[in-house]
């Protein structure tokens, strides 16, 4: 259950692509699109979006350990700027993604389930419980 930055970045990119399409077409998501949207995890572990990606030479500023994220990050930014309703909206979306790096948190549903199962196996009466997945529709 290791955190794979590239997979998360790709899943987030697909979810954002769906959102941009839905916004343009002014319609609700299909079941298939909802499934893609459920895979969105935020950018809390993806500081790569803070790096420069405007031209291919920018990769030299990236740490070696994250250079495999250069191309998908570049594609994400290009997609947002080409698919958003207008340039101001695209800039707002990209800045929002960058700003969320330090404040976006995601708890995998497997972790929520493990905590829930562990609590259920005790005889403790729980009156209040912090739900680590607010917004993910996963509850303890």
Task: State where each predicted segment sits.
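Class I S-adenosyl-L-methionine
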Residues: 2-140
């Amino acid at each position: 259950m290791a955190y794979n930055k590239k997979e998360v970045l790709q899943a987030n990119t697909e979810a954002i692509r769906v959102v941009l399409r839905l916004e343009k077409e002014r319609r609700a998501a299909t079941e298939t699109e909802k499934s893609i949207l459920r895979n969105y995890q935020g950018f809390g572990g993806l500081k790569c979006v803070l790096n420069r990606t405007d031209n291919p030479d920018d990769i030299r500023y990236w740490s070696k350990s994250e250079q495999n994220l250069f191309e998908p990050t570049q594609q994400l930014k290009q997609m947002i700027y080409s698919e958003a309703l207008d340039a101001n909206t695209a800039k707002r979306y990209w800045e929002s993604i960058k700003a969320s790096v330090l404040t976006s948190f995601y708890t995998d549903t497997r972790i929520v389930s493990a905590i829930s199962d562990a609590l259920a196996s005790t005889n403790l009466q729980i009156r209040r419980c912090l739900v680590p997945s607010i917004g993910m529709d996963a509850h303890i």
